[in-house]
């Protein structure tokens, strides 16, 4: 994912589909933190309710910008990234609960999903953009700051402590999905029963489309045919977003936390993954994790062991 979070920029377009009536189906479209979003309300609602929902959407994106956006130097996560080692920081309940979920995913994947890879990510991207690669010594030095086990969460005091001052958290692999979950919750809290939410390719639905069928999605990178999703989320990841060729090797933007190196594209590598789950946060994290396996077959086997519904594209499929 390319620079998922920058300064927030909101534009909401409301389309009154049945304009001759007092109640209408609504579509909200815009850009939040450089990423396009689309929200379709499948219920008939009046203008006043539509304006309230518009406000709530704005507030939800603002929460993500204020708390989870590591491109915002004043966000909570940025303050954590700037903190020195063994400094106990008080954080909001919202961020604490989110990081608990991140820790759960880290443990479930045995460290394959690790948001503390930011130091390595920055190292590799800076080198690849120059047409070079870092030395093994540089990679090993930066790896010392990587590992979510270097993060200590204190639930009683709602605090976080880093054991290494260079440890920095990159939430790009999970915060989009979490925001989509928050948007759906916001709509449900405002008595919306049927809706489609998409932000930067991460999708979640409730209820049905206005014509009465379940919502349909086309995961173009893995399936390229419509599938119905019934009140669940769908998230994708792939090596198609960024790549660099250096010394006859093609590298992607996805860093493997175990090796400390970006994934290389070859005839066996996983090219794209799509995951369906009731939580978009989880689908988002699992889609990224499944990219890390050496082949489509190994990725599928791990997904089956986790009971995941997936679509996985390999180099030969």
Residues covered by each model-derived region:
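Short, linear, compositionally biased motifs with a strong N-terminal bias
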Residues: 14-15
